[in-house]
Amino acid sequence: RSVFPLDIIKLTVPDLYVTIVHPQIEVRTADARSILKQQILLKDAIKQWGNIAGLVAGLEQGNYELIGRSLEDVLIEPTRSILIPAFDQVKKISKELGALGGGISGSGPSIFMLSTNEFTAKSVEIAMGQIYDSIGLSCHTYVTTINTNGIQLMDAS
């Protein structure tokens, strides 16, 4: 199946909060791409496709447990995470605080975590900031909800 034409499908997304931390480092997309494996094992591909299907189904069904189980990237994250200081610590602490899961946003260095409520999302935000403070790296953190409207043209005036 080709991605041309691109199919754009609107998902029904449950109320989720997104916590994002952006460490003040540069990760060039070209560098992040250059370290990826050119070939993957079939067992890893099968697991990744299952996780993607589980994530889409979990979002559509509002099944938080399935969303959490499916937020595992076995192809890209293990390699790219080495470019992001404290990545593993941020992910571990966030899940301990109740986040469903998360991962690398784009090629990095931003990390996102999904939570079912604002209290958890804010707790994750505080912990993310503390982790980067403890290693002497500035960061910006954000808590928001998922935009279900998609791209919109805004008046610049």
Where are the regions that the model predicts?
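ATP-dependent small-molecule kinase catalytic core of the GHMP/sugar-kinase superfamily
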Residues: 1-97, 118-157
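Short acidic/polar active-site loop segments enriched in Thr and Asp
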Residues: 100
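Short acidic/histidine-rich active-site segments
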Residues: 104-107
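Glycine-centered loop/turn positions within well-structured domains
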Residues: 109-111, 149
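Short hydrophobic/aromatic beta-strand micro-patches
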Residues: 112-116
